From Swiss-Prot:
Residue numbers annotated as active site: D68 (proton acceptor)
Entry note: cofactor: Binds 2 Zn(2+) ions.
Gene Ontology MF: a single term: exonuclease activity
Cofactor: Zn(2+)
Keywords, comma-separated and alphabetical: Endonuclease, Exonuclease, Hydrolase, Metal-binding, Nuclease, tRNA processing, Zinc
Enzyme class, broadest EC rank: hydrolase
Protein name as catalogued: Ribonuclease BN
Organism: Salmonella paratyphi C (strain RKS4594)
Record note on quaternary structure: Homodimer.
Keyword ATP-binding: no
Residues noted as binding Zn(2+) 1 in the record, renumbered to the chain: H64, H66, H141, D212
Family under the similarity heading: Belongs to the RNase Z family. RNase BN subfamily.
SUPFAM superfamilies (UniProt xref): Metallo-hydrolase/oxidoreductase
Length: 305
């Protein structure tokens, strides 16, 4: 998996940062895909600067209904209708996202030419497509708001072909069954258990993508042990009280969460427009002082998971 940041500003766009939107590129060898997390104003325009087209999107996850995370959705849906074959799309989000989509399309005389499914969610597992699971966690914000934890299923360990050949097993269909962990019977009557010839399973990659939030209990469960945590750092540590009062987090609080959750890396986003480039570097330094494995996202930054 890899993350492509389309917008990294908080509240309003700036000359260098658009409002929130993140692509998750699912780099599976046989079942690749593209998901979108939040869809602030101008998201479809930002996508024009990437290799991804709205028609490629399979799922959109909305964290909450504040405009800087949502107002790009109607335009993207309409443009997707003109994007070629009518591939299905599912939108996940809090209560009200269905009404928002229906109302904006109706009042603007617009429609979609593809199968559109809308899932209004609550906290808990919301998706398992056979390759990965998505769990939603309710966060602390003035509007109903969620963060999403995406975890790939573990991959089977490598098959010890050399040991199997030494045991008299001929490569071919039997190897496929053994790699699946099955027990096979050889021509001489011997039974071979595939589990005995498999290396330990390879843990799937994991990412936690937070919506806007002040510190809360659910945040630790959402982030616990993930390879990558994407979290807002709207304001610096000196403005922590103001950030929390508005349902946001400071640099110090975000970095402390990353450390306590033992994540692999922290990626900072949702930066207040009050910070210029020098100010953004100060935010990054505040996080790295607590959690060194921190990166600052810019529009069009790409991070592997």
């Amino acid at each position: 998996m890899e993350l492509i940041f389309l917008g990294t500003s908080a509240g309003v766009p700036t000359r260098s940062r658009n409002v929130t939107a993140i692509l998750l590129h699912l780099q599976h060898p046989t079942q690749p895909g593209v998901w979108l997390f939040d869809c602030g104003e101008g998201t479809q325009h930002q996508m024009l600067n990437t290799a991804f087209h709205p028609g490629k999107l399979e799922r959109i996850f909305i964290s909450h209904l504040h405009g800087d995370h949502l107002f790009g959705l109607p335009g993207l849906l309409c443009s997707r209708s003109m994007a070629g074959p009518p591939h299905p799309l599912t939108v996940y989000g809090p209560q009200g996202v269905r009404e928002f989509i229906a109302t904006t399309l109706r009042l603007s005389g617009s429609w979609t030419d593809f199968p559109l499914q809308i899932e209004e969610i609550s906290a808990g597992d919301i998706l398992d497509d056979g390759l990965r699971k998505v769990t939603a966690f309710r966060l602390e914000h003035p509007l109903e708001c969620y963060g999403y934890r995406v975890v790939e299923h573990d991959k089977p360990g490598a098959l010890n072909a050399r040991a199997l050949k030494a045991a008299g097993v001929t490569p071919g269909p039997l190897f496929q069954a053994l790699k699946a962990g099955k027990t096979v019977t050889l021509a001489d009557g011997r039974q071979i258990n595939g589990a005995d010839y498999l290396a330990p399973a390879v843990a799937g990659k994991s990412v936690a993508i937070f919506g806007d939030t002040a510190p809360c209990e659910a945040a630790l469960a959402l982030a616990q042990g993930v390879d990558v945590m994407v979290h807002e750092t709207t304001l610096d540590a000196s403005m922590e009280e103001k950030a929390n009062a508005r349902g946001h987090s400071s640099t110090r609080q975000t970095a402390t969460l990353a450390r306590e959750a033992a994540v692999g890396r922290l990626i900072m986003t949702h930066i207040s427009s009050r910070y210029d480039d020098k100010g953004c570097q100060r935010l990054l330094a505040e996080c790295r002082a607590i959690f060194p494995a921190t990166e600052l996202a810019y529009d069009f930054s790409v991070f592997p998971v």
